[in-house]
Amino acid sequence: MRSWAGDATTRLRAVSAPQFRTDLHLADRVLDLSRPVLMGIVNANPDSFSDPGHRSLEVQLDQVRSMVAEGAGIVDVGGQSAITDVAEIDPAEETDRVLPLVEAIRAELPDVVISVDTYKPVVARAVLAAGAHIVNDVSGLRAPELAPLVAEYRAALVVMHTAAPPKVRLQASDLYDDVVADVRDFLSAKVTEAIAAGVGKRSILIDPGPDFTKTPAQTVEVLRRLRDLNPSGLPVLLALSRKDFIGALTQTRPTDRLAGTLAAVAAVGSGSGVVLRVHDVGEVRNFLTVLEALTATDPVDADLRLTDDLRWAT
């Protein structure tokens, strides 16, 4: 692996994270995105690389409680893994996995914004009827019924770039003539489609789809040029956490990619108009807290102190 320092002609660029529109309109509220909002990942499936194995509803709900306490403003509930070598499940089974958790969150934590990671209209209708606020569609609106359904419930929609159907692994260095232009044009067309179906423009987030039908180099190029692929300045969902492009750069497994995740957050995910989809809510929150303190111009509270119980043991 190349030395992190590079060669003598290489210099670190000044980090200036992109800034995008700072309001996201949901059916019952407007979400303030003037600072990055953390979306905690909650897997209601046994196939996820981060949370393998069956977990009871109470265990899942306890994870939601912990993420909210750590600073998550949104929880993203998923019932089907995006892993390509795991078979797709039918909509009824996916609904059975996610609906009880959505209902439990709404009942116990009504202030929490609920996103559901699905591209299936049957699942989306069930969770929207139960009170979910956002449909996180990783298919790029392949189901024509999905956008009108989101509009019917006045919910928000995540439009993600991908060049293949769900569960299809496609990575090739020559797949795109210009990956940034292709992602920009795809997202622009899909946003237009969603608006035509009745979804409010202020209820749409775009997702450049890191790793989805992109090589690590293509993902890095897309993230470097995030401003270029979002000329309208729509809010952006960034799913950077533990991604394969980070693993390729650092040659690490998913569970060892926190440092790389934080570096990606600093570079492209620390500005306004951003939702960060993350596994490690507390760590990302702490990182952003320190980053903001060190880069802001506002004075730090003069009375700020560390409590004795948090000091190094003597």
Q: Over which residues does each language-model region extend?
A:
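Active-site-adjacent loop and "lid" segments of alpha/beta metabolic enzymes
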Residues: R2-A8, A17-Q19, L26, L33, ...
